[in-house]
């Protein structure tokens, strides 16, 4: 019977059998059978989930909190390359922390996001934001465990934060003098008066709207250099143009500048400029509406092969403002702007139509042009022209704002602070403090100052929340939660100085609540007028830290489930090495 089966039947039987993927296919893909399994998730609910998040937040915050205040300690961080890093910068410490437990690490990562966001907006106050976020989340967890509705609690905290911000804005003080600017910078630089004077001098020379950058110096002394230049908020078109991989930026000395009002996509458009760059052996920077297609590919290919140093940047602004900015760059660098309106074709460019500058630095976000070859008379005429348009009564407020920005970039120049030190570790630590101080100073100039040392938040807790009248026990809990949380920065500063934080904070809120400027100088151990003593915080820094911290921490309190990737299961042990399994063949081979 079996022999009578036709070839067709045999084929159908074979085809109906389940097919198996050959093991070699997995091996060729570098995957084991164990790795083909689906990864599962781990979940924690309710109190257990919030407790794990809180533990991670506590661990990270404990590391960051040690840096707060004039007597805060440094943190030593291992580096994957080079020397270990010593720093008091809160966001740097926060980013260095990774926890083994995935649920705890989830909380730590959210706290890292708070610090990073505060750093992006205000440039300082990251440690304060971390302290506040930890305190607010801790209070929220307690209230939720006591039976409060998490969503109502979040809304109540947000309303109380708004009341605190209004109180702080009503009591801020604008800064106008060089001495006040130096005070802000000194406090943010951990009491380093030298750094405070350095930043105030830089701001005095380039103006409050000028550009100040911080670089590593080559000597043991700090230096201040002021050079004429321009900065605009557009970075490199492609990361393939990067020349400094560690700092993720492009740096050229004496580059040629090509300015085009239109989008560049054809290779023929940029060939004359590329040839001029090759002939003169100078880097080339193309600034245009956009560069894409074959033109971009050719530039990247030449850069990767090492045949040509080249980079491309988009023109900042929109519409007529973009044309004006391009004209400003042209005057600054003595470059011809290629535009169809004047029948200036890029493919007909010659070397004398290209601009030149002493140096150019391009990051992902912005570009700084230093020592352009444009004549001072042409730049002065351009500035007068802009001032005339600003003075015109028909110019709108929006246009005036954009014109003021252009004027500052043309006339303000660029100040470069070169941080010196005896070693790379020392320079890195000091540079962190200088950058923080510079950001704090800019924030203070922008929005004003408040008494420092956590004093402003203490007085806001005592007086600013008095206008918020609770109508129920739940609302009272919300207000009490925020009052307890926003006193934490002042308490931490005092405790880092080796004193009893609860006693001093209690005295400030009870005996000195009516005096907004009265606070505690942790460096000297005295109750003083904080503004008169030069102990100040920028309003922008305090406000941003509070808003960012309360937003994330109160939202965390509404979390009911936490989900993470489960740890990978270890596969079975492989066979021992060598040819041990063939030992039984020995007797039959003679």
Swiss-Prot record:
Task: List the top taxonomic levels of the source.
Answer: Eukaryota, Fungi, Dikarya, Ascomycota, Pezizomycotina
Q: Which gene encodes it?
A: HSP60
Tell me which Gene Ontology terms the entry assigns under biological process: adhesion of symbiont to host cell; positive regulation of cellular response to heat; protein refolding; response to heat
Q: Which organism is it from?
A: Ajellomyces capsulatus
**Location of the transit peptide in the chain:** 1-43
Report the protein's function: May participate in assembly and/or disassembly of proteins imported into the mitochondrion. HSP60 are ATPases and have affinity for unfolded proteins.
The protein depicted here goes by the name Heat shock protein 60, mitochondrial
Repeat: present as a keyword of the record?
no
Family annotation (Pfam families): Cpn60_TCP1
Q: Which PROSITE patterns match?
A: CHAPERONINS_CPN60 (PS00296)
């Amino acid at each position: 019977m079996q022999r009578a089966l036709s070839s067709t039947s045999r084929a159908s039987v074979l085809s109906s059998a389940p097919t198996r993927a050959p093991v070699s296919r997995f091996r060729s893909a570098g995957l084991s059978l164990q790795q083909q399994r689906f990864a599962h998730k781990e979940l924690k609910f309710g109190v257990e989930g919030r407790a794990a998040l809180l533990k991670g937040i506590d661990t990270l915050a404990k590391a960051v909190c040690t840096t707060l205040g004039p007597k805060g300690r440094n943190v030593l961080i291992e580096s994957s390359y080079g020397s270990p890093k010593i720093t008091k910068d809160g966001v740097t410490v926060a980013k260095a922390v990774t926890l083994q437990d995935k649920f705890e690490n989830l909380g730590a990562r959210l706290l890292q996001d708070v610090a990073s966001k505060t750093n992006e907006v205000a440039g300082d106050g990251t440690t304060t934001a971390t302290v506040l976020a930890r305190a607010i989340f801790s209070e929220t967890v307690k209230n939720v465990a006591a039976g409060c509705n998490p969503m109502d609690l979040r809304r109540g905290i947000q309303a109380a934060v708004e009341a605190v911000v209004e109180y702080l804005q009503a009591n801020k003080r604008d800064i106008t003098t060089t001495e006040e600017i130096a005070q802000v910078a000194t406090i943010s630089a951990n009491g380093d008066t030298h750094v405070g004077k350095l930043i105030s001098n830089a701001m005095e020379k380039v103006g409050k709207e000028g550009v100040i950058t911080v670089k590593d110096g080559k000597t043991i002394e700090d230096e201040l250099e002021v050079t004429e230049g321009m900065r605009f908020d557009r970075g490199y078109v492609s990361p393939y143009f990067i020349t400094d991989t560690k700092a993720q930026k492009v740096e050229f000395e004496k580059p040629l500048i090509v300015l085009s009002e239109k989008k560049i996509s054809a290779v023929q458009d940029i060939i004359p400029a590329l040839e001029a760059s090759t002939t003169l052996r100078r880097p080339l920077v193309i600034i245009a509406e956009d560069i894409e297609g074959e033109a971009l590919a050719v530039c990247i290919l030449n850069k990767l092969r090492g045949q040509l140093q080249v980079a491309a940047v988009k023109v900042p602004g929109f519409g007529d403002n973009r044309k004006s900015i391009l004209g400003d760059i042209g005057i600054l660098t003595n470059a011809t702007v290629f535009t169809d309106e004047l029948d200036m074709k890029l493919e007909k460019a010659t070397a004398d139509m290209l601009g030149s500058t002493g140096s150019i630095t391009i990051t992902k976000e912005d570009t700084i042009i230093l020592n352009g070859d444009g004549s001072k008379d042409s730049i002065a005429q351009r500035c007068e022209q802009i001032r005339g348009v600003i003075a015109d009564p028909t110019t709108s407020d929006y246009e005036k704002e954009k014109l003021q920005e252009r004027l500052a970039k043309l006339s303000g120049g660029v100040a470069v602070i070169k941080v010196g030190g005896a070693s790379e570790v020392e320079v890195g630590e000091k540079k962190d403090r200088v950058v923080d101080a510079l950001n704090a100073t800019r924030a203070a100039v922008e929005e004003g100052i408040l008494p420092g040392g956590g004093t402003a938040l203490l007085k806001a807790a005592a007086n600013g929340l008095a206008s918020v009248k609770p109508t129920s026990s739940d609302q009272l809990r919300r207000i009490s939660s925020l009052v307890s949380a926003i006193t934490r920065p002042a308490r931490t500063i005092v405790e880092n100085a080796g004193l009893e934080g609860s006693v001093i904070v209690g005295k400030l809120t009870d005996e000195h609540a009516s005096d907004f400027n009265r606070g505690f100088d942790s460096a000297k151990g005295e109750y003083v007028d904080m503004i008169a003593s030069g102990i100040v915080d920028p309003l922008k820094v305090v406000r941003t830290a509070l808003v960012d911290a309360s937003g994330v921490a109160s939202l965390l309190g509404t979390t009911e489930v936490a989900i993470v990737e489960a740890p990978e299961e270890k596969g079975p042990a492989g066979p021992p090495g060598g040819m041990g399994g063939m030992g039984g063949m020995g007797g039959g081979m003679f």
